[in-house]
Amino acid sequence: MNPKRSFQALILTLHNYWADKGCAVLQPYDMEVGAGTFHPATTLRALGPKPWKAAYVQPSRRPSDGRYGENPNRLQHYYQYQVILKPNPSNLQELYLGSLKAIGLDPLLHDVRFVEDDWESPTLGAWGLGWECWCDGMEVSQFTYFQQVCGIECSPVAGELTYGLERLAMYVQGVDNVYDLNFNGREGEEKISYGDVFLQAEQEYSRHNFEFADTSMLHRHFIDAEKECLALLAAGAPGDNDNQRLHKCVFPAYDQCIKASHIFNLLNARGVISVTERERYIARVRDLAKACGEAFLLTDAGGLNWNRAA
């Protein structure tokens, strides 16, 4: 399949490229997240000493970015391609440029530039040194060296690559409207466009995000998710008689943190959160993320026993 002819071929090409580089090609996380970084394969696995390589597509939702399907390049639901490499390889930029070449953007034939743009996620308590990648004057992706995640220092530093798949596909296919993207690589009656797949959903979710979402219920759900996250962390905490001192309920707790984050984004889209309240909500989600990150370090995946074995 030609990555210049279909959205799905672009994804498959990136899958094959990063699989050849040793990454575990994972599936999207089955929850509403604001970015690929929220996937536990990045947020949690970036912590601790254990090496980790993964790549995946992540459907991402940013309710406030909806435009009822009327904007050609702004969406409330879109796709990111995420790569996480820990420890970050010395040739990360070279690997990234190789991936561009694989999808048909030869750096020798295009004006590829890296523009310094440090990255931050306040709700995840995460930040890193980063660069946007611009190709012929348009941003197509970003790479970041994580310094902190969940308010915890990353040691070793992990390298993260994030591709905006719709924007990248629009560039390689040469179209100006995201809904005109060829999705399946066929032409004529067999052609399926991005709009065929997603336009109606984009229109309906814009109505939901801006007009219909029940704000009273969302406020209650936020509190419920916050309480459940903390309760699960407390229930799974290692006891005094646990010889391994392992935490036993990190991932279910982190799911509740993700839920709280998405609910906050919906409340923000509905316009019912003041500037002061917004900062408080962000701090509450960040506290949950920090607690989940600290608990993850008390697990095998977080490197507790791996450290001991070393």
UniProtKB/Swiss-Prot annotation:
SUPFAM superfamilies per UniProt: Class II aaRS and biotin synthetases (SSF55681)
Protein EC: 6.1.1.14
Keyword Cytoplasm (UniProt): yes
Keyword Metal-binding (UniProt): no
UniProt cross-references to PROSITE patterns, sorted A to Z: AA_TRNA_LIGASE_II_GLYAB (PS50861)
GO cellular component term, pick one: cytosol
The protein, known as: Glycine--tRNA ligase alpha subunit
Alphabetized InterPro entries for the sequence: aa-tRNA-synth_II/BPL/LPL (IPR045864), Gly-tRNA-synth_heterodimer (IPR006194), Gly-tRNA_ligase_asu (IPR002310)
Entry's localization field: Cytoplasm
Homology family: Belongs to the class-II aminoacyl-tRNA synthetase family.
Biological process according to GO: glycyl-tRNA aminoacylation
Catalysed reactions, as listed in the record: tRNA(Gly) + glycine + ATP = glycyl-tRNA(Gly) + AMP + diphosphate
Position of the signal peptide: none
GO molecular function, one term: ATP binding
